[in-house]
Amino acid sequence: MGKIFYIMGKSASGKDRIYSLLVENKELNLKKLILYTTRPIRAGEEEGVQYYFTDDRRLQAFEAAGKLIEARAYHTVHGIWTYFTADDGQVDLSEGNYLGIGTLESYEKLKAYYGAEYVIPIYIQVEDGERLQLSLIHISEPTRLA
């Protein structure tokens, strides 16, 4: 049986960069666990690559079908944006290993759903001063950290 390696860490800890490097390493043969979001797609993003972009109706359909694994809602100036993981058939642990990225809360829900023996946590810890510096670079030069 395969595993789900799940990357977590505070904002600006480098999670996305580490995720990208691991996915790009063909020797690891990791499949991507792609989350859903109700927020609008951003410039440079592609449907089914970073996220599946959807709406509240689909979120509710997953929930009604008992296929909603976890969901997190964020109150933004543009409204409520929800990020969620659903059992949509993309994960088949008999077919290999997966790589996901999220929060500690979403990790706990995935672990409860798939089982602790199948969900392996990877926590990225970076000193707060360095995270601040990375955040400032990201704001002023978004392509520099890519």
Identify the residue ranges that each predicted region occupies.
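The conserved Walker
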Residues: 10-11
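Walker A/P-loop
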Residues: 16
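Single conserved hydrophobic/aromatic residue that forms the stacking wall/gate
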Residues: 137-146
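Conserved phosphate-donor/acceptor-positioning beta-strand/loop module used by diverse small-molecule
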Residues: 99-103, 114-135
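ATP-dependent small-molecule kinase phosphotransfer cores
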Residues: 37-98, 102-104
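Post-Walker A helix-loop "phosphate-sensing" segment adjacent to the P-loop in P-loop NTPases
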Residues: 24-32
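Hydrophobic anchor at the beta1->P-loop junction of P-loop NTPases
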Residues: 7
